[in-house]
Amino acid sequence: MQSSHVKNETTYNIPLLINENVISSGISLISLWHTYADEHYRVIWPRDKKKPLIANSWVAVYTVQGCGKILLKGGEHITLTGNCIIFLKPTDIQSYHCEGLVWEQYWMEFTPTSVMDIPLRQQSIIYNGDIYNQELAEVSQLITSSDSMINNLAVAFLTKI
């Protein structure tokens, strides 16, 4: 599989938050992406990042549908399927790609503003997937607002879900 720039690889790859961090409710959200990828989607990390890699940040990847695979430094592979979330250290990620025909996911990079007990590399199933997906869609709408108060509300809502 050939790697190319992520913008040319997806059905859509929407940066919902990328220009500035939004701080609320214990986290500083660095970036939020909603990606609907096809079988050609392959990203070498952190080459695709639009912002500098921050060592103390976290990445949460929530798979809405389909299947994706993340390759970590050291050779470990993590396969993600629908209604599943995982938290990773961005410095551990080597690459990721769509594993199959489609991979719809939300990619969130954030730094905690307080001590958080986050389970690293442990996939968690979201059993109320339809509700969770609807809430993420609402966060996506709020985070794109030009009003900073609404952005803060979106991040607070994100930490709640």
Where are these regions (language model features)?
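Residue-level recognition of conserved beta-strand positions in structured domain cores
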Residues: 62, 72-74, 90, 98, ...
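A short hydrophobic beta-strand segment most commonly corresponding to one strand
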Residues: 85-87, 100-117
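Tight coil/turn sites that cap or link beta-strands
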Residues: 40-48, 82-83, 91, 100
